[in-house]
């Protein structure tokens, strides 16, 4: 029975990390500089799940958070302070590869998965209490 609680708990932690990642993507959807201030747009991040915990226990965990390699949108805005200064894309601003609608859908899915795991955990606790 307690293994079931561990599985639900691991899923809750994984979904919380996924939600944090999605929130960061939404917050940086218009960021035209990287975190370190270097040129280039923010890159969307994705939480990668794996089963188990590497120690033989069941459940799920976030194995890593990777950057989405896809290219964001370039918008012609020569007056923008972060516009590309020279070359074929002079005057263009590179925006992140974050689609806010997709991120909102992912946030809803993560929220529903979190709720489902709370329900499973509560059901397990009820079964433990009944025995």
Where are these regions (language model features)?
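Amphipathic alpha-helical polymerization modules
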Residues: 1-131
């Amino acid at each position: 029975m307690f293994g079931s609680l561990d599985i639900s708990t691991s899923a809750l932690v994984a979904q919380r990390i996924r939600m944090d990642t999605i929130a960061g993507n939404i917050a940086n959807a218009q960021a035209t500089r990287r975190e370190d201030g270097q040129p280039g747009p923010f890159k969307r991040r994705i939480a990668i799940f794996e089963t188990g915990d590497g120690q033989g226990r069941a459940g799920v965990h976030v194995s890593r958070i990777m950057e989405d390699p896809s290219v964001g949108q370039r918008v012609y805005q020569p007056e923008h302070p972060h516009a590309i200064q020279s070359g074929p894309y002079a005057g263009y601003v590179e925006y992140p590869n974050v689609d806010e609608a997709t991120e909102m859908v992912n946030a809803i899915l993560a929220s529903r998965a979190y709720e489902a795991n709370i329900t499973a955990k509560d059901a397990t606790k009820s079964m433990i209490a009944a025995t």
